[in-house]
């Protein structure tokens, strides 16, 4: 029954996670996508999920996941908080990277709601910008959506609203600077057919810049933007 539910979520266009069973385990290089391995230490990940079907046919998927490994941080010279000449942060380039997360997805039939929250530790530039250490991180998102089924010209239309926050090191950037993200998105996804879809989103965003240059790097940026996919 579980595998049939996972398959049905994908086949019906509800964006299920796929028919991978209730328990999964993986090993990967840990240096993020399209990056060569730099320390020969593999990340290990485990995930468990279960799709519960209510009497009315609506499905609620709940799950947990966790990973750990050693992440190799790249470094570049940066001006310390106290000012002066730019220096390369101290600390080992290889820092333990570990996270645990819990999530749920109430699939839109027609109303839906999903959320995820993550906690962990990973590399992060210190507040004085003189060293890179293992520090706490946390964040998550919540999204509400509606599934409108088309009779002509499309399969489904999904209007949605999403809010997300993250506080922690941005490990894939040089020096792993502390990253603060607060973002509200309004969007709509239009599925022409099973092979073609168009998504438009408008975001109100507050994010930390990755720019390490200048006397006052890693500034928080505020703005609004529109995205198409």
Where are these regions (language model features)?
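Aromatic- and glycine-enriched pocket-lining scaffold segments that form the walls
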Residues: 1-65
